[in-house]
Amino acid sequence: MKIMVVGGGGREHAIIKKLKENQEIEKIYALPGNGGIAADAECVPIGATDLDGIVKFAAENAIDYAVVAPDDPLVMGCVDRLEAIGIPCFGPRANAAIIEGSKVFSKNLMKQYGIPTAAYEVFDDAEKALAYLETAPIPTVIKADGLALGKGVIIADTREKAKAAVISIMQDKQFGKSGDQIVIEEFLEGPEVSVLSFTDGETIVPMISSMDHKRAGDGDTGLNTGGMGTVAPNPYYTDAVAEECMNNIFLPTVKAMKAEGRPFKGCLYFGLMITKDGVKVIEYNCRFGDPETQVVLPLLKSDLFTIMRAVTDGKLSETPVEFSDKYAACVIMASDGYPVKYEKGYEITIPADITDKVFVAGAAKKDGKLLTSGGRVLGVTAIADQLKDAIDSSYAMVDRIHFDNAYWRHDIGKRAMEAK
Ligand code: AMP
Ligand code: GLY
């Protein structure tokens, strides 16, 4: 069995390490992968959005199964293209990936099907949006409709900042066509929970919950990043919250997508906020979260490839999906200056006894050395019986990994510990 994983970050490394547990799989290719993933898969220099290159590679190398992990190729229709040449895939088709690809689509879907989310208005005209902001409640949240590298959400605590956001998205086209339409929505408050799920379009099985740490600095300060660390499970996700989510959000979403003729198959990610008025959807993603995947998959006891095949074949209801009852913590080591400006090319040293705990995101291999090549460089995941031990053990490994200009948050898991 030859597998191809599209993508090249820490999430893909976590997926590949988990897939390797399956004995049927003889070969894994990563497109493009990275210098760290190269230890676990054969990396092929084809970019994740080069759909022609991906399809050609798959055909020429008799790939048996493809996992498309990042948002862009999914939204661009990578799965549709691979299925068209007979390759079964894990990941939604473009008509379902739109749940992440268009915030206007997802907000309208939730409104139509009564799925709880922040109240909102949609605008395709900057003047109307600016006029609305004269009287809108503040703080308010401005979201570019399309994909924007995780930067398309602006929380404005003054009317002036809100208007500036509208101008930069709609008039200055900061995110290009992604800003042709915007959503302006109610500002919600409460603890956030990430829930990744497997769904085959009918059945939905939530994975263990997790908590991301999106801001760059300790104490949740500084700019938003792709995520500086995660813990799982999330202590705010109690059994009662899980039941509410299943009844009001998870099942209704899967049914809504089916009813719209857009059955979602793959990993559907729910970004949730537990507000005083109940759990609400902040965002959907059409893929595994990063770095949520680096704590969720290491806790998965069942075989990932078996579950993925069941999702593709519409047999998820017959397939066990079991998680460990332990805790996981992942600390991201980044290049200092991320997410704005950072230097690259520094040698990374990872002690041999902990390489299996390290998921590499931004590193290149050169002359046998592993060099930093991105903002988020790697994630270090520890598992333990108690959350505190997982956090301590992850930080103990971080202290043993070296590269110049390394930066990491020192408080991953602190909020989760305080919630207990
Ligand atoms: P996203 O880029 O969609 O992941 O959103 C980034 C972050 O913005 C989320 O994780 C939330 O912390 C925050 N956010 C998004 N929408 C809202 C909202 N309506 N109210 C409060 N915070 C929000
Ligand atoms: N960690 C959030 C995301 O993957 O979008």
Model-flagged regions — what are they?
Residues 152, 156-293:
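Internal nucleotide-binding/catalytic subdomain
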Residues 21, 36-38, 90, 112-114, ...:
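Solvent-exposed alpha-helices and their adjacent loops that cap or buttress functional pockets
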Residues 246-268, 285-353, 366:
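Active-site "cap" helix and flanking loop/linker of ATP-utilizing ligase/carboxylase catalytic domains
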Residues 43-49, 121-125, 156:
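Short acidic-hydrophobic, aromatic-tinged amphipathic segments that line or gate anion-handling sites
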